[in-house]
Amino acid sequence: MSSPQNKLSRDAIRDTWLKHTKMNKGNIRYVFLLGESQMTKELEEENFQTMDIILGSFKDTYNNLTYKTMMSFQWATKHCRNAQFVMKTDDDVYVHIPGLKRVINENANALQNAVGGSCQRIASPIRDKRSKWYASFESYPEKTYPGYCSGTGYVTSLNVITKIVEISKTVPFFHLEDVYVALCIKKNGLRLHPISGFMLAYDF
């Protein structure tokens, strides 16, 4: 997933780790997913050159990341029906493609019913209104979140993505996308699968 103003990041990704997809190594495909903004015309022009941008019909804001994530899942189930695995990541993340292929091969069976990445088993809602991750009692009355994988990047099977899309029709909207996906995972009886190869910057 990307933000409209992050063209330099998209170009850097295209010129670095996405080169593997251009050389068809590992049969990997990608798209950048974005919402509507004042830059929609520029994004359409960028896509005319790159043919790798999908625009959703929602405002591209932080509080709409759940819409963006679910759009990406819905798009994958419709346009990637022959895919075995799907990875969701952000435009400020570096993906080591050979490492990703190894991780998928080593965890292929587990990922048939799980989402893998840098996962927390439990976390508490932040009630401070000044926080980027603020959650009101009205939007989330429980004391703890279900376990979740960091939205910076996770991998799973198309089978799991399909199940999440279906169950999302019965899960009320929540603005923190990684928590929302976790709610769908929990309701579906799916699992989290921590993978050591997924590292956040503050993990070092």
Model regions and ranges:
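Secretory-pathway lumenal glyco-enzymes, predominantly type II signal-anchor Golgi glycosyltransferases
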Residues: 1-204
